[in-house]
Amino acid sequence: MKNKKIMIRNAFLCLLIVVLLCSALFCVRYQHTSSKRLAERWRGDVIAQYHSPLDKDGDGMDDQVDILEGAINYVNTHPKYKSAYYAGGYPNDGYGVCTDVVAYALKEAGYDLMELVSKDIEIHGDMYDIEIPDQNIDFRRVKNLYVFFNLNAESLSTDLKDISEWQGGDIVIFKNHIAIVSDRRNQHGVPYVIHHANPFQKTYEEDILEKHDDIRGHYRWNNG
């Protein structure tokens, strides 16, 4: 009987320790995504960064680099993950989701994604699966951006072996997610992505492309 009590006590203590460790991990990771950038790990031939011929906002920085810098600058504000509706479309309370990384990246280059998507829905409404258009949220849905970029952006290879085709500032769309392609690469030459997937994400820049089998599209914004 005494041994049984000891076993029960030890089991309870082990369970308590596990619960405490899980709680600590939850507190450390929840909504504490780091904006620290990953190190460049590619040691092969130099892959020149693509530069767009466009400079929409006239700041002396081409659109491709502007979009990349816009994504980096946005995640440097440390947005917390939350899906919510905003009357003005763009989140203004320090929260956001994956589509907001892309929207703010394009905004820094001089493009209002909310307005662009809204106008495109007016023109190509039959291409979008939308019953009642709402410009405040339509541009923040991955399924709509998939249609939008297919219609309005340059569509590129989704083959990760074609590493030079993947450039910082490109846009990649997965089944239920979207991200900006980073200008830094892993040891295979495959670029990282800058994205916002969930409240437990360790860093905004992550090496995930090779882990995904659901890449639906790879795009470059050359529509000035």
Question: Which residues does each PLM region occupy?
Answer:
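Low-complexity, Gly/Ser/Thr/Pro-rich intrinsically disordered linker/tail segments
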Residues: 189-224
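...with weaker cross-activation on analogous glycine-rich loops/strands in unrelated enzymes
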Residues: 122-200
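Bacterial peptidoglycan biogenesis and beta-lactam-recognition machinery
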Residues: 107-113, 185-187, 217
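N-terminal Sec-pathway targeting helices
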Residues: 1-19, 26-28
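N-terminal capping segments
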Residues: 29-146
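Cell-envelope/ECM-targeting effectors and their regulatory/trafficking segments
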Residues: 19-20, 35
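Residue-level marker of positions within ordered structural domains that often coincide
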Residues: 76, 106-107, 184, 198, ...
